[in-house]
Amino acid sequence: MRAPRRRCYRVRPMHDVSKLEKRLLRAAANAIRDFELIGDGDRIMVAVSGGKDSYTLLHVLMRLRERAPIDFDLVAVNLDQGQPGYPAEIVERHFQAVGVPHRMLYADTYSIVRRLVPEGKTTCPVCSRLRRGVLYNAAAEMGCTKIALGHHRDDLVETLLLSALYSGALKSMPPKLRSDDGRNVVVRPLCYAAEEDIAAFATAMRFPIVPCDLCGSQPNLRRKRVKALLAELSDEHPAVKGNLLNALGHVVPSHLLDRDLHRLVASTGRDPWLDGDEDEDGGCLQGEVADALVKLAGAREDA
C-alpha cells in the first residue's frame, strides 16, 4: 500500500474561506437537526484541545448560536493534562480573543498514563479515557447538559473500518451518546464534516494550533494504516469516505449476521425476505420490524 499524498493547506482567499465556512455550518446544522444534538436551554461544554478540529467546532457552534431559532449557551473548556510544555495559555488567549465564556482545567493524567502504558506503546486510548473522565466530572459540576467533541466524518469512517477489521464489530462513533455513568450526553456536531474542509478552514483562520504529540506517544499504527488505505482509495474514487458515512445511516439489518437481531425480527411474525420489507438493493425495514430494532437497541443499552 503506497503512502497517501501529503496535502498542503494554504491560506485561501476570503471568498474561499466563506465557502468553507458555509459548508461546515451546513454540515453541522444538518447533524444537529438529524440527531437532535442541541435543544432549547442547553448549556454546551465545548471541549477544545487546541487542535484544528476543536477550534473549528467552537467557531461553528458560536456562529450557529448567533442565528439559531433556539436559545443555548456555550462554554469552552480546555484541559491541561500535565504534558511537558503544553501551552495552555495559547488556547486561553484564543478564548479571550473570540469572547467565549471559558474555563481552564488542569489534571495531571500524563503521569498516570506513563505509569500504566509500556514504553513504545501508544498512550492515546488510556489518555483519552482519563480525559473523558475529567471532562465528565467538570461538565456535571458546571451544570452543562451536553459535551461537544470535534470528531468529524473521517474519524467516523476510520473507526468503522477499525472496528470491522480489528474487532469484528460493525460500529463507529455515534453522533450522540449518553455516558456510561448516565450523567452526561456527548454530541459530535461535526460528524458530517470532512477533515479536509476542517484542516483548510483552520489554516485559513490561522487558529493557534497546539501540537498533538507533546506527550511523545507513538502513533496508533492501526488507525494510521486505515487512514492511509482510505486516502489511497479516495485517490481512485473520491466518493469513498462519503459512501462509508452514508453506509452508517443506511443499515440493512436482514442482510447481516446478527443472531439477536434476527430473533427479534422473527418475533414480529414477519419475514423481511418474504414479506417485502427488504430488497436486494438495500431498502430499509419498516413498521414492526423497525420497532424490533428499537427494542434491540434498548436491550443492549441495559445489558
Curated annotation (Swiss-Prot):
<dbReference type="GO" id="GO:0005524">
    <property type="term" value="F:ATP binding"/>
</dbReference>
<feature type="binding site">
    <location>
        <position position="124"/>
    </location>
    <ligand>
        <name>[4Fe-4S] cluster</name>
    </ligand>
</feature>
<dbReference type="GO" id="GO:0051539">
    <property type="term" value="F:4 iron, 4 sulfur cluster binding"/>
</dbReference>
<dbReference type="InterPro" id="IPR035107">
    <property type="entry name" value="tRNA_thiolation_TtcA_Ctu1"/>
</dbReference>
<protein>
    <recommendedName>
        <fullName>tRNA-cytidine(32) 2-sulfurtransferase</fullName>
        <ecNumber>2.8.1.-</ecNumber>
    </recommendedName>
</protein>
<keyword id="KW-0067">ATP-binding</keyword>
<comment type="function">
    <text>Catalyzes the ATP-dependent 2-thiolation of cytidine in position 32 of tRNA, to form 2-thiocytidine (s(2)C32). The sulfur atoms are provided by the cysteine/cysteine desulfurase (IscS) system.</text>
</comment>
<dbReference type="GO" id="GO:0006400">
    <property type="term" value="P:tRNA modification"/>
</dbReference>
<comment type="subunit">
    <text>Homodimer.</text>
</comment>
<keyword id="KW-0547">Nucleotide-binding</keyword>
<keyword id="KW-0694">RNA-binding</keyword>
<keyword id="KW-0819">tRNA processing</keyword>
<feature type="binding site">
    <location>
        <position position="127"/>
    </location>
    <ligand>
        <name>[4Fe-4S] cluster</name>
    </ligand>
</feature>
<keyword id="KW-0004">4Fe-4S</keyword>
<keyword id="KW-0808">Transferase</keyword>
<dbReference type="InterPro" id="IPR011063">
    <property type="entry name" value="TilS/TtcA_N"/>
</dbReference>
<feature type="short sequence motif" description="PP-loop motif">
    <location>
        <begin position="49"/>
        <end position="54"/>
    </location>
</feature>
<keyword id="KW-0479">Metal-binding</keyword>
<keyword id="KW-0820">tRNA-binding</keyword>
<comment type="similarity">
    <text>Belongs to the TtcA family.</text>
</comment>
<dbReference type="GO" id="GO:0000049">
    <property type="term" value="F:tRNA binding"/>
</dbReference>
<dbReference type="GO" id="GO:0005737">
    <property type="term" value="C:cytoplasm"/>
</dbReference>
<dbReference type="InterPro" id="IPR012089">
    <property type="entry name" value="tRNA_Cyd_32_2_STrfase"/>
</dbReference>
<comment type="pathway">
    <text>tRNA modification.</text>
</comment>
<dbReference type="InterPro" id="IPR014729">
    <property type="entry name" value="Rossmann-like_a/b/a_fold"/>
</dbReference>
<dbReference type="GO" id="GO:0016740">
    <property type="term" value="F:transferase activity"/>
</dbReference>
<keyword id="KW-0460">Magnesium</keyword>
<keyword id="KW-0408">Iron</keyword>
<keyword id="KW-0411">Iron-sulfur</keyword>
<feature type="binding site">
    <location>
        <position position="215"/>
    </location>
    <ligand>
        <name>[4Fe-4S] cluster</name>
    </ligand>
</feature>
<keyword id="KW-0963">Cytoplasm</keyword>
<dbReference type="GO" id="GO:0046872">
    <property type="term" value="F:metal ion binding"/>
</dbReference>
<dbReference type="Pfam" id="PF01171">
    <property type="entry name" value="ATP_bind_3"/>
</dbReference>
